[in-house]
Swiss-Prot record:
Belongs to the UPF0178 family. This is UPF0178 protein H16_B0290. HAMAP family: UPF0178. It comes from the Bacteria. CDD domains: PIN_YqxD-like. It comes from Cupriavidus necator (strain ATCC 17699 / DSM 428 / KCTC 22496 / NCIMB 10442 / H16 / Stanier 337).
Amino acid sequence: MQVLVDADACPVVVKEMLYRAAQRVEVCVTLVANQYMRTPPSRFIKSLQVPAGFDVADDRIVELVSSGDLVITADIVLAAAALDKGAYVLDPRGSWFSRENIQERLTMREVMEQLRSSGVDTGGPAAYAQQDSKAFAGQLDRFLARHAPPGAVA
């Protein structure tokens, strides 16, 4: 099991939690981004820089992900592709994407896109808050307790 992170838009606090978790449970965390990402020195943490371009990082994550891996992303289309490959998908606010909710989220994304293209100001996501950070940390810890490699300290 590995953790793949859609790192370009991932909050710094989430990346820091993932770095600590990688060391604690000895699981590989790979940040995929179209810009350089400085990571702490660790055999469990790596950064993969991809060329700039629409969905290049997402496409690379889909290439790398396997069944049972964990993907961290807020991108609904990437989440759907990762679920199709048998991965678990958690957003940085601590909400799980699942086979049960992905279609609804894709539909809502399409509706919002249509509203924006017709000139409606739909606003943006709420600012990342401490409660989001706590929710993510809790979900990550529960996941790693169930799925960490044998002998790891979750």
